[in-house]
Amino acid sequence: FYWVGDGLYREKITTELEQFSNFKWLSRMKYPDEVKDFLSEIDIYALITGMDTAPLTLKEAQLMQKPVIATDVGGVNEMMENNQNGFLVKEGSSKDVIDKIKILINDKELSLKMGESGRIFVEEIFSWEIIAKKFLDSISNYIKNEK
């Protein structure tokens, strides 16, 4: 079990988890090489937060075909499809997080399917070409409506 990153709760969480021999806190990682290496090693990506609005790491994990478990806060629910490429969990529900982790650990086929689905989702929704086209369409519509 790896914990990556920092934040308001790091000290409280790491103090609690250090009692387990399979826990390792990796601190912050150098981008992009360490992040890519880390994502290639893990089986499940969990983004358990109360404050991220649209975390890039979520898309990175999906592009690496990792099933995602993420807290349903901010814009996270727009960055994935619940029960398709991962699971959204209620903020503060550790039981829900544990239940979803168990599902993915016990069902490798589902885990692989969700990982692949996440990659496809990000490529179809968040590619630079698609984002640029949507942006240009928005600007074009705005200009047309201003005349």
Please state what every model-predicted region is.
Residues 12-29:
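Nucleotide-activated donor-binding/catalytic signature segment of Leloir-type glycosyltransferases, i.e.
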Residues 43, 65:
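A short alpha->beta transition loop at the rim of the catalytic pocket in nucleotide-sugar-dependent
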Residues 67-70, 80:
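Short hydrophobic beta-strand element within catalytic cores of glycosyltransferases
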Residues 37-42:
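Short alpha-helical donor nucleotide-sugar binding micro-motif in glycosyltransferases
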Residues 96, 103, 110-124, 131-137:
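A short, well-ordered alpha-helix in the C-terminal region of glycosyltransferases
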Residues 50:
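Aromatic "clamp/platform" in nucleotide-sugar-dependent glycosyltransferases that forms part
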Residues 36, 54-63, 77-78, 84:
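Short alpha-helical segment that forms part of, or immediately flanks, the ligand-binding pocket
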